[in-house]
């Protein structure tokens, strides 16, 4: 029997790319992994099972969207990942008014599960529920299913709370967590939410990608 979200494929997907990439030294979205830009790889991965086109939350002067709709933050000042989530909520309310929720993924985590949206949607029981991914005992709220209905509360909180800790905002709402197991590879278990922050991480990601390709 379908849950509150009857068809996870109809959840609008958003790439969060509003970070500064300071530890990488260059824009992470355009570094190459396996001969393919991260932007291309991640947009393709999240879009595989979604019927609604992927949108990109990034700065207005983003150099190349690769055809994705560009949705800059509705509140300027680089207020963190939740500013991108708010932007996605506002965009969804305008362009996909049928959708109760949207899904976000960051631009720097290339190995997240293909069925991410379906798994996050499973525990959702109401229009105000949030669902976030977890793995190895850690929360990954940037991999989240977010209700459009809490946009006003999120905007008020972003403008009022100078610390803007994600966990503090989540504490205001009903949050359901979905734990994802590690991925078995030829060189050991891989955290599905491994992210690329530094050049060394990119080197490791190439090793994981090669291992995944060798794994039966």
UniProtKB/Swiss-Prot annotation:
GTP binds at residues 16-18, 28, 57, 73, 108. SUPFAM superfamilies: Nucleotide-diphospho-sugar transferases. Mg(2+) binds at residue 108. It is an enzyme of class 2 (transferase). The keyword Nucleotide-binding applies. Its main location: cytoplasm. Its cofactor is Mg(2+). GO terms for molecular function: GTP binding; metal ion binding; molybdenum cofactor guanylyltransferase activity. It is found in: Cytoplasm. Its EC number is 2.7.7.77. One of its GO terms (biological process) is bis(molybdopterin guanine dinucleotide)molybdenum biosynthetic process. It catalyses: Mo-molybdopterin + GTP + H(+) = Mo-molybdopterin guanine dinucleotide + diphosphate. One of its GO terms (cellular component) is cytoplasm. Keywords: Cytoplasm, GTP-binding, Magnesium, Metal-binding, Molybdenum cofactor biosynthesis, Nucleotide-binding, Transferase. Pfam families: NTP_transf_3. Gene3D superfamilies: Spore Coat Polysaccharide Biosynthesis Protein SpsA, Chain A. InterPro entries: MobA-like_NTP_Trfase (IPR025877), Molybde_CF_guanTrfase (IPR013482), Nucleotide-diphossugar_trans (IPR029044). Transfers a GMP moiety from GTP to Mo-molybdopterin (Mo-MPT) cofactor (Moco or molybdenum cofactor) to form Mo-molybdopterin guanine dinucleotide (Mo-MGD) cofactor. Belongs to the MobA family. The N-terminal domain determines nucleotide recognition and specific binding, while the C-terminal domain determines the specific binding to the target protein. HAMAP family: MobA. Monomer. This is Molybdenum cofactor guanylyltransferase.
């Amino acid at each position: 029997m379908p849950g509150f979200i009857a068809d996870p494929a109809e959840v609008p997907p958003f790439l969060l790319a509003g970070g500064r990439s300071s530890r990488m030294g260059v824009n992470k979205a355009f570094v190459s992994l396996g001969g393919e830009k991260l932007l291309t790889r991640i947009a393709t991965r999240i879009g595989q099972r979604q019927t609604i086109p992927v949108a990109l939350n990034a700065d207005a002067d983003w150099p190349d969207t690769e055809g994705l709709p560009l949705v800059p933050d509705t509140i300027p000042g680089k207020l963190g990942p939740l500013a991108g989530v708010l932007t996605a909520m506002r965009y969804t309310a305008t362009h996909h008014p049928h959708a109760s929720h949207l899904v976000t993924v960051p631009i720097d985590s290339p190995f997240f599960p293909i069925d991410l949206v379906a798994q996050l949607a499973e525990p959702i029981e109401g229009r105000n529920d949030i669902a976030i991914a977890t793995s190895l005992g850690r929360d990954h709220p940037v991999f989240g299913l977010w209700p459009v209905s809490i946009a006003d509360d999120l905007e008020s909180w972003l403008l009022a709370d100078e610390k803007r800790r994600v966990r503090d905002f989540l504490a205001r709402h009903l949050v359901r967590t979905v734990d994802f197991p590690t991925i078995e590879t030829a060189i050991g278990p891989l955290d599905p939410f491994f992210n690329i922050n530094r050049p060394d991480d990119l080197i490791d990601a190439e090793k994981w990608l090669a291992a995944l390709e060798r794994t039966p």
